[in-house]
Amino acid sequence: MKVPFLQLLCLNAALASANVVKGAAQGFAAGVTGGGDITPSYPKTNEELVSLLESDEPQVVVLTKTFEFIGTEGTTTENGCAPWGTGKSCQLAINSNGWCGKNPVVTITYDNAAKNGIHIKSNKTLVGEGDKGVLSGKGLYFEGGVSNIIVQNIKITNLNPGFVWGGDAFTFFGADLIWIDHCETSLTGRQHYVTGFHPNTRMTWSNNFLNGVTTHSAGCDDHHYWTMELVGPGDQITFQNNYVYHTTGRGPALSGTTLFHAVNSVWSSIPGHAIEGGDKGRGLFEGCFFEDVVEIAPAKPENQLFSASEANAASCKSALGRACQANSYSKSGAFGSSETGFFKDFAGLTIAPAGSATDALAYVPKNCGIGRL
């Protein structure tokens, strides 16, 4: 029996951690409770917000305004570089860890706050009220084994968009049981989502808007390149009902040994490529829609990819316990990868339900991101 797309989104809704959270995580992060039933806190200042998120106690934190971090930690002026020229729409780069190499040297000035995210600790719920919950000039950082965290209905923006290495929206460096839902990321210096060199397990990223429209880019236009760099060993990510828009690369880069289950997500307006990475990255894509994507993935990708079609959908049963939903395409390149050798790695994980790709196209772009719960 075919389950309607909207009904899929309502499954397990009774498991929400507190009344400020809408719905419940599906996929790998199923069961996450965040701060639980703790009485919500409504911070008024940056200092109050940081203190709550970095505390060792469970917290439910509700954002009711824009928290402006730009200028709060000063600026740095130093030598950087111009890998793509100095045109008004070209990104320059911070010389992080000697990244600039032999590229032309230029003097740059960037805001310090965006380079250092808030180090959110375990058992937290962070939720925005309506469309008001915005972090401007500061991202979130999950490290050191933190677990059981919900972030829902917020926007992270203005992270030194003119500079590569200027700031990441969501950084994961050893985390478990994390649900990122209905969030928008935009105007980042580097990645919208990045996983580091420690395992990041049981994560669900759902209903998010990865907005690639930017002021400066590696292509010297308004398409952001640095989208999702996933390099953790053994990352486990359900990528459900997300909208990747107006980017040109790394969407995602499966560069570590990430297990990436993309379900009912939409990629649109991508003049470059979407998927890349190394030979150990693993990605299953089903019920997804690719619209105006010049190159979805290389014809012979290094990584292990499975793109669901009507012809191969039944082969998913060994991994997911059900057949896959076929992907769909409009004005996009081919995506014929059918590697199944990694399907055994789904054992023991909670699998998100899937609807059709055409239903995803109709629903996801209009309902993802902040203010659309």
UniProtKB/Swiss-Prot annotation:
Its EC number is 4.2.2.10. Glycans are attached at N123. GO terms for biological process: cell wall organization; pectin catabolic process. It is found in: Secreted. It comes from the Eukaryota. InterPro entries: Pec_lyase (IPR002022), Pectin_lyas_fold (IPR012334), Pectin_lyase_fold/virulence (IPR011050), PEL (IPR045032). Disulfide bonds join C81-C100, C90-C220, C316-C324. The active site is at R250. Pectinolytic enzymes consist of four classes of enzymes: pectin lyase, polygalacturonase, pectin methylesterase and rhamnogalacturonase. Among pectinolytic enzymes, pectin lyase is the most important in depolymerization of pectin, since it cleaves internal glycosidic bonds of highly methylated pectins. This is Probable pectin lyase C.
